[in-house]
Amino acid sequence: ESDFLSKPTEPAIARHRIDNILKTNRRLNHILQKQEALRIKSEVDEMTHLLNKATAEHAISHILLSTPEELHALFAIDIDNFKAVNDIFGHKMGDHTISVVACILASHFSGSDIIGRIGGDEFVAFMRDIASRQAVYEKAQELLDAILDKEALSIPENVTISIGIAFTEPYETSYTTLFQKADTALGNSKKSGKQCFSEYGVSA
């Protein structure tokens, strides 16, 4: 009798148990999907769909710590004249400009690279295990060129970007130090008239 209870042969009972299992699975899948959606939302910048500041920093730090012997490069990227865009054309155009720059970055870096928005009009991009510095210089120039077609991008004429680049030293594992170098190089690009890239430690 106990064997009959543990292995029901009545079709109605079997279907009921199967339905319960399927319902439970659907509920679990729904919960997992919601959890995954919340996780993604917590890691991604809502406007640009790039990584947010905390997630980008964490991802880059992980690579620096796990592959300290490799050559990596960090880009610090800033939209030139962004305050003027907001003041003259309004915040809607400002948001559009940020989204355009984000799309340019997303389309020019590979899936193994890390791209994040770290502030209002500030971004970082991280190229890992690079073969040569020349590849990084070429990537920076591609980005500068990509934003020049203002009409196609529907952005104001005065919008450009400035870029600062910092390469890792052997066994350099601090994201903070690397970012400070890239940010210093970005400042040099701004001082040089904007719409250009500069490398940390290299005089213009």
PLM ranges: what are they?
Residues 8-9, 129-131:
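Hydrophobic/aromatic docking surface of two-component receiver
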Residues 126-128, 166-168:
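Short hydrophobic/aromatic beta-strand micro-patches
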Residues 117, 133, 145-162, 190:
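Catalytic core regions of nucleotide second-messenger enzymes
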Residues 9-46, 54-64, 114:
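Signal-transducing coiled-coil linker helices
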Residues 39, 52-73, 80-110, 116-120, ...:
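Conserved long alpha-helical elements within nucleotide-processing catalytic cores of c-di-GMP signaling
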Residues 22, 86, 144-151, 183-186, ...:
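Protein kinase-like catalytic domain
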